[in-house]
Amino acid sequence: MRFKGEFFNAIDAKGRASIPAKFRETLSSVYGDERLIVTQSDGGLAAYPYQEWHKMLERVEALPSNDLKEAINLAIISPAVECSFDKQGRIQLPKAQRCYAGLESEIREIVVVGAIDKIMIWNRTKHIERREQAEAFLRAQSQELKNLGF
């Protein structure tokens, strides 16, 4: 079982985000570890299970030293933080990450999305816009979708 589903929620005044119980159960049962590594990703936040994060680091380390590797290190790896759950199933999102993802305004609505091997945390408005763009793209790819069985 991997991460799937979409959950609408909010960040509290202290910057804590509740992660759905279904996702916490997957962390325990599939990964045996509830720690998450949270980093910036394409205007939102990506929360990786500890093991998935380390697999990704190994792939990055294997890259030759070049502009791509440097960009990955600066934009994705450097801002990453380890997060653990409190007793209410929340993680503390650092202010810099909340600002990056547009989660620092008076409206603190978020969407927590399962994305197979990671959990994405989006500003609700941004998530809806991205999903509409994805749906339009998929309509243009109808034959490819049929080939995949969708």
From Swiss-Prot:
One GO MF term attached to the UniProt entry: DNA-binding transcription factor activity
Keywords from the UniProt entry: Cytoplasm, DNA-binding, Repeat, Transcription, Transcription regulation
Keyword Membrane on entry: no
GO cellular component, one term: nucleoid
Superkingdom of the source species: Bacteria
Gene3D superfamilies noted in UniProt: Transcriptional regulator MraZ domain
GO biological processes: negative regulation of DNA-templated transcription initiation
Intrachain disulfide bonds: none
InterPro entries: MraZ, MraZ_C, MraZ_dom, MraZ_N, MraZ_sf, SpoVT-AbrB_dom, SpoVT-AbrB_sf
Pfam families documented for this protein: MraZ (PF02381)
Positions of the SpoVT-AbrB domain: 6-52, 80-126
Localization of this protein: Cytoplasm, Nucleoid
Complexes and interactors: Forms oligomers.
Family: Belongs to the MraZ family.
Stored PANTHER family: TRANSCRIPTIONAL REGULATOR MRAZ
Protein name per UniProt: Transcriptional regulator MraZ
